[in-house]
Amino acid sequence: FIALDLFVFYVFFEVMLIPMYFIIGIWGGANRLYAAIKFFIYTMAGSLLMLVAIVALVWRVREVTGYLTFSYDLLLTHAGAVGSLAPWLFAAFAIAFAIKVPVFPFHTWLPDAHVEAPTAGSVLLAAVMLKIGTYGFLRFAVPFFPEVALSPTVSSVIVVLALIGIIYGALVAMVQPDIKKLVAYSSVSHLGFVMLGIWGGTLQSVQGSLMIMISHGFSTGALFLLVGMVYERRHTRLIEDYGGIARVMPLFSLILTVVALSSIGLPGLNGFVGEFLVLLGSFGTYPVATVIATTGVIFAAAYLLWALQRMIFNRLDKPENEQLTDLGRRELVLMAPLLIGIVWLGLYPAPVLKRMESATRRYVQLTQPARNTNPVAVQGTSARVAP
């Protein structure tokens, strides 16, 4: 995240795969090897495309400047030197980052990786690793090739895929019998909002995307921790195997409810701020697409509240659940920072928004000329961007 050298970024983009591969492959579930290999192949394939694009970009900039450099600022300044290669280089960067996000239809590795990964692996994957994809779009793919990224055709594809991810992820989550897989598909839906906000191109929408990236780490990380805690006690992730556990695990049920409501986007909790800013900021650019995206919020409420109702508010009718113990001191200490972050970001997001304002404003200014030359991004689902 802090690399200002494209070579350093690529090296650590690849290095991230190694520990996650072993976390899933060694300490994962029954199908851990399948999930680990699938995760590795998907992300490595995208990374190799990005490597080719980096080499081509650096070589073309060298022909213009005379310097063989991976410096971010210098490459950004002279990225226009790639000329007719720009669409191909953007495609290579975009595929690599879309796999990492993941954007539909590159998402199929994520549910398997989450389900088979141990709790710590799922938390790390959701809270940190998925964000490198959306960060890559914000930091490299769009700023390097704005004329391509914000062209009507590419914008149409990205916004449509974001909408599919939002709605598809929510609908698939709604029918999941496995609580961990439900949370995994909810990530596909949430990160669709991030992509919509990035292409929304306004200060509000880009800030909203960054806020969702931060909030998703708190909320989804907390959900995976809670799923892991109850799994240690019951050794099942099937929602139907629970029911009425609020009577024997009141603290767990209270925390799970708060975290689920934050993931839904309840006002006063962290999830609301980012989604509201994305929808507010994207409406001027893509009004119809933004209205369609709001259905994802409704579906999120449906699948999470329904899961809560089945897990903690039904009758306590299974003998195995009567023996469950509530969260201990160690587990409460572990959850406390996440709960503080969830509430703090929901009630007082101003310091975070102020901290990111200069970077988001620079991104908007950097991409504004390309938006002005391509004022209509999605036929039938967009409006002109104000100059």
Each model region followed by its residue ranges:
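Hydrophobic alpha-helical transmembrane segments of multi-pass membrane proteins
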Residues: 41, 91-98, 125, 157-167, ...
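Juxtamembrane/interfacial segments at transmembrane-helix boundaries in multi-pass membrane proteins
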Residues: 49-107, 112, 137-157, 205, ...
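Predominantly late transmembrane helices and immediately cytosolic-facing juxtamembrane segments
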Residues: 104, 220-223, 290-323
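Membrane-interface alpha-helices at helix entry/exit sites of multi-pass transporters
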Residues: 35-38, 117-127, 237-254, 291-296
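Acidic, glycine-rich loop-and-beta core segments that form the ion-binding/anion-interacting portion
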Residues: 111-113, 117-121, 133-217
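Alpha-helical multi-pass transmembrane bundles of energy-transducing inner-membrane proteins
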Residues: 1-85, 172-185, 191-238
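Glycine- and aromatic-enriched alpha-helical transmembrane segments of multi-pass membrane proteins
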Residues: 326-353, 387
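Helix-loop-helix module between adjacent transmembrane segments
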Residues: 1-4, 96, 130, 264
